[in-house]
A protein has these predicted regions:
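Glycine-rich NAD(P)-binding loop of the Rossmann-fold in SDR/ketoreductase-type enzymes
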Residues: 64, 96-107, 148, 152, ...
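Mid/C-terminal beta-alpha module of Rossmann-like enzyme folds, strongest
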Residues: 222-286, 291-292, 296-306, 311-323, ...
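NAD(P)H-binding glycine-rich loop region in Rossmannoid oxidoreductase-like domains
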Residues: 50-100
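Conserved Rossmann-fold NAD(P)-dependent oxidoreductase catalytic core, especially the SDR/UDP-sugar
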Residues: 85, 106-151, 174
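N-terminal Rossmann NAD(P)H-binding glycine-rich loop of SDR-like oxidoreductase domains
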Residues: 4-26
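Conserved beta-loop-beta element that borders a ligand/cofactor-binding pocket
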Residues: 126, 162-185, 231
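Substrate-positioning beta->alpha
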Residues: 199-225
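Functional cation/ligand-contacting sites centered on basic and imidazole/sulfhydryl donors
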Residues: 375-517
Length: 517
């Protein structure tokens, strides 16, 4: 039997460990893993070496090093780039986030391009690149606007890194946009930082588990090795758990807190949580990967039952009054440097505007749940949660992409490119384009006057637009959306049309805001 070498970055993360566990059930696969030279990763490496012997090769390095990336991918049949610095670390150390999410992606792409023959390349992206959604447009799909939230260095960096893959010289690539991931230690991991308060109560979320994500990657390798999925490559996918994992921020907290005898309203207060500037949505195209690879199992409710079964001591929380848990476990986190409440109290205007719309809007939230309409309880007039949750609703309430979306990428012609560009406030300058190869770069101009090159697939099918308007440490979507109906149709779901804020980090890494002129 021929063996296949899969090179992986990011194998020590929650998703990565699940992927290794599942992929190693394929007898024909060997792994080469790039680890940071840190205590936790060395310990994990020793454990895998004991478990898998010479089927796993581990070396220590850094994605910042092109030489390390080249060593990782040399001679591989497949390369899986899962490496990422995610929140809350990305919030505290945006420099580290850039190292992995931008520079690391660039080095991985360049290393794969340099190989002869090239390995097939799978790049794991994130739902965070879409930016905020609420009950006005809870459903989304690949091709929707990519508007990462202000101060989200993770989302912005992953957006930039993903684009490097799409218009690269890699022959066989795939991008998988991972949604929010459920893993066994999720609850405990979120009671040590103010990050939990970034999640609005009325945000749509479609979760996936680490285990199912691992099964997906295993099945991708298995089916591609067997030659069963030639159409998988050169496409972008949303990875979600499907109908049984669709919920909201409010109901996610409710499900987790039920294990310790409480719920969202017992432990939280409306004014503690952001009302916008998050990410996540329900994927209308979530079943594309499932139909190809059959990776899903169980449900959102099953996940929490399994967590409680593995952590019986959580049930001891039921004998403690909710007010005590609220004070000792959650209220103390309001003082954390990553807590929206602390930002407001310290007068951080940038973050206050970004996450609430302003100080007045935050103050109006208060502590009384009777004054806060909860979407999933049908308390928002005109928006029936159960109706919106139904996939039949999605089909008639999707965002426009500005062209005839029924056409495949091979069928789109210049009229489609011109129409899509116009809907984005710009132009396609290659009027001699004819339908055929939608992966060859053409020339575009955005409303800001930037001229850039990108393939029709990157723009029409993947949702990217002008790379010169997307600048690290800067978020100016208030301005950009005014001339870009493609952006405006969703940006103005959570931003007033007269908002004109430029959000940015200064040279000291301080979150700032000013009028965009």
């Amino acid at each position: 039997m021929r063996s296949y070498l899969v090179a992986m970055s990011g194998a020590s993360g929650n998703m990565g460990q699940a992927v290794v566990r599942e992929v190693m059930t394929l007898p024909c696969v060997r792994l080469r893993l790039l680890f940071l030279d840190e205590k936790r990763e060395r310990r994990l490496g020793r454990r895998w070496s004991r478990l898998y012997g010479d089927r796993v090769e581990i070396f220590f390095g850094n994605l910042k090093s092109f030489a390390d990336c080249s060593r990782l991918v040399a001679g591989a049949d497949y390369v899986l780039n899962m490496a990422a610095v995610i929140p809350p670390m990305a919030d505290r150390r945006p420099d580290l986030a850039r190292d992995a999410n931008v520079e690391g992606a660039a080095n991985m792409v360049r290393a794969v391009e340099s190989c002869v023959p090239q390995p097939k390349f799978i790049h794991v992206s994130t739902v965070a690149i879409y930016g905020h959604r609420n009950y006005l447009h809870p459903w989304g799909r690949v091709g929707d606007p990519l508007l990462p939230s202000a101060y989200d260095s993770y989302g912005l960096g992953k957006l930039i890194g993903e684009r490097m893959v799409l218009d690269s010289g890699v022959a066989a690539w795939a991008v998988i946009r991972q949604t929010g991931m459920l893993y066994d230690k999720l609850l405990m991991a979120n009671v040590s930082d103010g990050l939990m308060f970034h999640t609005p109560f009325n945000v749509p979320i479609e979760w996936a588990t680490d285990t199912d994500s691992g099964v997906l990657l295993r099945n991708i390798f298995a089916r591609d090795i067997a030659g069963e999925v030639p159409d998988f490559w050169r496409r972008v996918y949303n990875l979600g758990g499907g109908a049984l994992y669709r919920t909201t921020g409010y109901d996610t907290f409710n499900a987790g807190f039920a294990m310790i005898g409480g719920g969202t309203e017992q432990f939280m207060r409306p004014g503690w949580h952001a009302t916008r500037n998050f990410h996540c949505m329900w994927f209308s195209d979530s079943d594309v990967l499932e139909d190809m690879f059959r990776f899903r199992s169980k449900s959102f409710d099953d996940f929490w039952r399994d967590v409680l079964r593995k952590n019986r001591y959580f049930a001891l929380g039921k004998i403690v009054p909710p007010a005590v848990i609220r004070s000792l476990v959650f209220k103390r986190l309001l003082r954390d440097a990553n807590s929206p409440t602390r930002w407001v109290e310290e007068g951080n205007q940038g973050r206050t505007h970004a996450f609430f719309g302003g100080h007045k809007e935050w103050k109006a939230l208060g502590d009384d749940w009777s004054n806060f309409p909860v979407w999933s309880k049908n308390q928002i007039e005109g928006y029936d949660y159960q109706v919106q949750l139904d996939e039949a609703y999605a089909s008639s309430h999707l965002l426009s992409h500005g062209y005839d979306e029924a056409k495949s990428i091979a069928e789109v012609d210049f009229d489609d490119l011109a129409s899509a560009a116009s809907f984005r406030g710009g132009f396609c300058l290659d009027d001699d384009y004819v339908a055929g190869d939608g992966y060859q770069k053409v020339t575009w101009r955005c409303a800001e006057g930037h001229t850039f090159r990108a393939s029709p697939y990157t723009v029409l099918k993947a949702g990217h637009w002008c790379p010169d308007c997307i600048v690290e440490n800067r978020w100016n979507f208030d301005r950009l959306s005014r001339a870009n109906p493609f952006y405006r149709q969703v940006w103005c779901d959570s931003h007033d049309e007269d908002e004109n804020n430029l959000y940015y980090y200064d040279e000291e890494g301080v979150a700032c805001v000013r009028e965009d002129v």
